[in-house]
Each structure stands twice: as structure tokens, then as C-alpha cells.
From Swiss-Prot:
Region feature (Complementarity-determining-2): 71-73
InterPro entries in UniProt: Ig-like_dom, Ig-like_dom_sf, Ig-like_fold, Ig_sub, Ig_V-set, IgV_Light_Chain
Protein name: Immunoglobulin lambda variable 2-18
Residues carrying Pyrrolidone carboxylic acid: 20
Annotated function: V region of the variable domain of immunoglobulin light chains that participates in the antigen recognition. Immunoglobulins, also known as antibodies, are membrane-bound or secreted glycoproteins produced by B lymphocytes. In the recognition phase of humoral immunity, the membrane-bound immunoglobulins serve as receptors which, upon binding of a specific antigen, trigger the clonal expansion and differentiation of B lymphocytes into immunoglobulins-secreting plasma cells.
Renumbered residue ranges of the record's region Complementarity-determining-1: 45-53
Protein species of origin: Homo sapiens (Human)
Taxonomic path: Eukaryota, Metazoa, Chordata, Craniata, Vertebrata
Intracellular or extracellular location(s): Secreted; Cell membrane
Sorted UniProt keywords: Adaptive immunity, Cell membrane, Disulfide bond, Immunity, Immunoglobulin, Immunoglobulin domain, Membrane, Pyrrolidone carboxylic acid, Secreted, Signal
Major subcellular site: secreted
Amino acid sequence: MAWALLLLTLLTQGTGSWAQSALTQPPSVSGSPGQSVTISCTGTSSDVGSYNRVSWYQQPPGTAPKLMIYEVSNRPSGVPDRFSGSKSGNTASLTISGLQAEDEADYYCSLYTSSSTF
């Protein structure tokens, strides 16, 4: 049975020159149990390309967001190692290997700088 991992982009406007920045995610990604999926988060050379402070959050329906990855590729304690993060150029990615039913959720990327969060 296939099920979708639904994605939304977390956008929190900053201030000054950062106020117009935004991160772009695909509208949805789907996979079947056991498969691997990669979710992209694309910015620009001024944000994602310049900072290693990309985080990923998982939000199952009706629950609060949970931090899954911070600083591009670091996993907090308790997050399974089948979740991994990476970055190439202006695009950060979250890869989920060996999909499980409980992985069905919204996934958000976020970028933190010293003055702004996107």
C-alpha cells in the first residue's frame, strides 16, 4: 500500500534584507514501506548556500513539530538513523530510508541565521 509523505514549507519572515527570502519544497512526495525518499528544500546562494543551519521538522497530524535534523546533517538523540540530512549548493535534502507507516507526516525545512529564521 502506498501512502504519501505530505510536505509544506515553513516560512517565517525575517527582517531587513532577509525579509523576502523563502525556502521552496515540493508539494508532496510519496513512497511505499521499505522504500527511500528524498525531500528537497531549495533556497539561494544567500541563504541555504551560505549557512549550515538548516533544520528539518516532522509533524504527524494533530501533533507538535518534532526536530529531526539540525545543522544540515545532525540528528538529535532518539531520531532513527534512517533519517539523514545533506546539502549541495543551494539545496538541502532530507532522506528517509526504509520508510515506515509512522513516517507519514508533514515535513518542514527551516533555515536559521543570526538575524532571521526562514
